Amino acid sequence: GGSSGLIAFPRL
């Protein structure tokens, strides 16, 4: 993840 564009949810 992480490509959602939301820094609030840093999906590694």
UniProtKB/Swiss-Prot annotation:
Keyword set, alphabetical order: Amidation, Neuropeptide, Secreted
Modification Leucine amide occurs at: 12
One cellular component (GO) term of this entry: extracellular region
Protein known as: Periviscerokinin-2
Subcellular location: Secreted
Protein family according to the UniProt entry: Belongs to the periviscerokinin family.
GO biological process, one term: neuropeptide signaling pathway
Record bears the keyword Transferase: no
InterPro entries reported in the protein's UniProt record: Periviscerokinin
Miscellaneous comment in the UniProt entry for this protein: According to PubMed:19808072, a longer form of this peptide exists, which is much more abundant than the short form.
Domain of life: Eukaryota
Function: Mediates visceral muscle contractile activity (myotropic activity).
